[in-house]
Swiss-Prot record:
Its main location: cytoplasm. Catalyzes the condensation of the acetyl group of acetyl-CoA with 3-methyl-2-oxobutanoate (2-ketoisovalerate) to form 3-carboxy-3-hydroxy-4-methylpentanoate (2-isopropylmalate). Residues 393-513 are annotated as: Regulatory domain. Homodimer. Residues 5-267 form the Pyruvate carboxyltransferase domain. Belongs to the alpha-IPM synthase/homocitrate synthase family. LeuA type 1 subfamily. Mn(2+) binds at residues 14, 202, 204, 238. InterPro entries: 2-IPM_HCS-like (IPR050073), 2-isopropylmalate_synth_dimer (IPR013709), AIPM/Hcit_synth_CS (IPR002034), Aldolase_TIM (IPR013785), LeuA/HCS_post-cat (IPR054691), LeuA_allosteric_dom_sf (IPR036230), LeuA_bact_synth (IPR005671), PYR_CT (IPR000891). Pathway: Amino-acid biosynthesis; L-leucine biosynthesis; L-leucine from 3-methyl-2-oxobutanoate: step 1/4. This is 2-isopropylmalate synthase. The gene is leuA. Disulfide bonds: none annotated. It comes from Dechloromonas aromatica (strain RCB).
Length: 513
């Protein structure tokens, strides 16, 4: 009988540390619900001590999620662990994930602690965590560059103290598969009582080896993999959940483990995270890329038509790919709209939220005749912005553009109940619109990224715009969608400005695995 492989998703914590990928509480809850629907075992909902906003989001997710363990990260100090324990208190199943660095360079340069002090602090951390839960994970930050003998020593002590999961992170993505697998094998072999805990891996993708390293460790005894949707994460990202899960499932002949993941929810989760964070999925991305099941070669096409398994090792529908289909139109009623949202796994909090979304749907249906599932996802994402998060609100936008003349934009913004109007010229209609908005907002933010993607096919398709703004040490992504690209751009820019302004934005606590 195959052993269970725990899937630990850290999209909401490590994934959110990607530049500009910070999410609101409502967005985090929406992602957490999708992860629960996908049957993820553990959801790392955030870093409770990082900010009041992070604490609140974890606490809300702990109240909402019933079928997955809700986890908070915490440094190995009493305050962090207390905040984590309070945040996960409402959870039906809660975990505290505490960590301390163990590599020589981290202990000396960052912690300024001796190895003995690090071991002592780690043991204390487990004791503090046990006051809140029996499910305690310990991570040795930068284990990939740590001395093996020291890892054996610290893991032995934290297991004695009550840790139930031992995580061996390759924090900077330094290891190669054979090396990482051997580390895992030796740890399990040498650490006393290693059979009493779950051994976990957390790999970063700096050398493009996060998934390979994780799978190599699974073959050597790891029974938890920490990963993120789309491989989202700081620097080059983390191990991609979809690749780990499908590798284990597709190569069941090789891996002695199985997961409980509902793989048909993988693509919906990928699209949701991409939409919320503003990080597009590259077309050739394994499993969830737009081209993952596309065949251009005539020889390949002929083979697939004759027998799918000639060139496909997975079925597209098994990971949640479906053909775009017309689902609703301008004559569709509120109940049909509500039912389709439920089929897509989209839950709105109240009748007021449903009414607002339905009103936006009717506006969209007047602009384009065919409404696809992707349109509904984009529409609901726009409606997740609550009034207290919408300091800047677009009231009116107009652009005059003609051949040989510089475009001129006119915008009206509502700021705190007061309308402000401005006009500006620009190198194009979008440039003019952004300049008009800035002449009112005066944010001083720097535009780092502007990108447009068609949500569906056709000339009447909605354009989904992502903007990335930087101000000081803060980077945020904004999203907006509309059949009018200029309006979508304005919404995206204002969405980013509102995130910069929002009191929910936070300064991340330093550290992480």
């Amino acid at each position: 009988m195959k052993q269970h492989l725990v899937i630990f998703d850290t999209t909401l914590r490590d994934g959110e540390q990607s530049p500009g990928a910070s999410m609101t509480k409502e967005e985090k809850i929406r992602v957490a619900r999708q992860l629960e629907k996908m049957r993820v075992d553990v959801i790392e909902a955030g870093f409770a001590a990082a900010s009041p906003g992070d604490f609140d989001a974890i606490h809300s997710i702990a109240q909402t999620i019933k079928d997955s363990t809700v986890c908070s990260l915490a440094r190995a100090n009493e305050n962090d662990i207390r905040r984590a324990g309070e945040a996960i208190k409402p959870a039906q199943s809660g975990r505290i994930h505490t960590f301390i660095a163990t590599s020589p360079i981290h202990m000396e340069k960052k912690l300024r602690m001796t190895p003995d002090q690090v071991v002592e602090q780690a043991v204390k951390a487990i004791g503090w965590a046990r006051e809140y839960t029996d499910d305690i994970e310990f991570s040795a930050e930068d284990a990939g560059r740590s001395d093996l003998d020291f890892l054996c020593r610290i893991f032995e002590e934290v297991i004695k103290a009550g840790a139930t999961t031992i995580n061996v992170p390759d924090t900077v993505g330094y290891n190669i598969p054979s090396q990482y697998a051997e580390t895992m094998r030796q740890l399990i072999e040498r650490v006393p009582n290693s059979d009493k805990v779950v051994w976990s891996v957390h790999c970063h993708n700096d050398l493009g080896l996060a998934v390979s390293n994780s799978l190599a460790a699974v073959l050597c005894g790891a029974r938890q993999v920490e990963c993120t949707i789309n491989g989202l994460g700081e620097r080059a990202g983390n191990a991609a959940l979809e690749e780990i899960v499908m590798a284990v499932r597709t190569r069941a002949d090789v891996f002695p483990v199985e997961t409980r993941i509902d793989t048909t929810q993988i693509v919906p989760a990928s699209k949701l995270v991409s939409q919320i964070t503003g990080y597009p999925v590259q077309p050739n991305k394994a499993v969830v890329g737009a081209n993952a099941f596309a065949h251009e070669s005539g020889i390949h096409q002929d083979g697939v038509l004759k027998h799918r398994e000639t060139y496909e090792i997975m079925r597209a529908q098994d990971v949640g790919w479906t053909q775009n289909k017309l689902v609703l139109g301008k004559h569709s009623g509120r109940n049909a709209f509500k039912n389709r949202l439920q089929e897509l796994g989209i839950e709105l909090e109240s009748d007021e939220a449903l009414n607002a979304a339905f009103a936006r749907f009717k506006e969209l249906a007047d602009k384009k005749h065919e409404i696809f599932d992707e349109d509904l996802h984009a529409l609901v994402s726009d409606d997740l912005v609550t009034p207290d998060q919408e300091y800047y609100k677009l009231v009116y936008s107009r652009v005059c553009s003609e051949t040989g003349e510089m475009p001129r934009a006119s915008v009206i913004l509502n700021i705190g109940g007061v309308e402000h109007k401005a006009e500006a010229d620009g190198g194009g209609p979008v440039d003019a619109t952004f300049k008009a908005i800035e002449s009112i907002a005066g944010s001083g933010a720097e535009l780092l990224l502007y990108s447009v993607n068609a949500i569906t096919t056709g000339t009447d398709a909605q354009g989904e715009v992502t903007t990335r703004l930087s101000k000081g040490d803060r980077i945020v992504n904004g999203n907006g969608a509309d059949t009018d690209i200029v309006i979508a751009s304005a919404r995206s820019y204002l969405n980013a400005l509102n995130k910069l302004h929002s009191t929910l934005d936070k300064v991340k606590a330093q550290g992480g695995v």
